[in-house]
Amino acid sequence: MILVDTSVWIDFFNGHQSVESAYLRTCISDAHPLVVPGLVLTEILMGLRTESDATRVADGLSGFDEAPPLDTRDSRKAAQIYRECRNRGRTIRSTIDCVIAQLCLRHGYELLAKDRDFESIAQVFPLRRVAIPMMVHDRPNPKSQQS
C-alpha cells in the first residue's frame, strides 16, 4: 500500500507535471491501493479556496483507504524521528512529515512524496520510498492532450 503525501496530491490536483504526480495518476488508473492519512487530507483541504472545492476533493479522496488513527505511541515515535534526524545533522522542517514517516514505518506503507524532509528521514530510518519506474516518465498526461 502506498501513502501519498500532500506534496504529490497538490501537483496532481493542480495539473503540475512531476514524475510523482504522473505515477499517482498511474496508480489511480490501475486501482493500486492508496492510503490517505487524516493529516494529509487536512493539509490538502486547507489549501482550497472554496467550500465547494473542499467538498468535491474530500469526496474524491474518500474513495481511498484511510490511515489508522494516531495514538500516543505514534506521537512519541514521530518526536524520536525528529530528534534522531536532528542529532545526525538533518533538521526536519515539518512535524507532520515526522508523523507521516511514523505512519509509514508502523504500518509498512511505501511513501510517495516530493518533500526533501522525507529524504533526510530515510537516511536515518528505514522509510520505504516508492521507486518510480522509468516508463511513467513517458506516459502522456491526459490533461495536456485536451484542447
What would you call each of these model-derived segments?
Residues 23, 95, 99, 117:
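Amphipathic alpha-helical recognition patches that constitute DNA-binding helices
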Residues 1, 101, 105-147:
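Acidic, PIN/NYN-like endoribonuclease modules and their adjacent C-terminal/linker elements
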Residues 5-6, 44, 78, 104:
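Generic structural signal for small/hydrophobic residues in well-ordered secondary structure
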Residues 21, 41, 54, 75-79, ...:
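A general structural signal for well-ordered alpha-helical segments in protein cores
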Residues 9-10, 41-44, 118:
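A generic structural signal for short hydrophobic patches within well-formed alpha-helices
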Residues 66-112, 146-147:
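Active-site neighborhoods of divalent-metal-dependent phosphate/nucleic-acid chemistry enzymes
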Residues 1-36, 46-59, 138-139:
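Short, well-structured N-terminal submotif of metal-dependent ribonuclease cores
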Residues 4, 36, 69, 112-113:
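Short beta-strand scaffold positions
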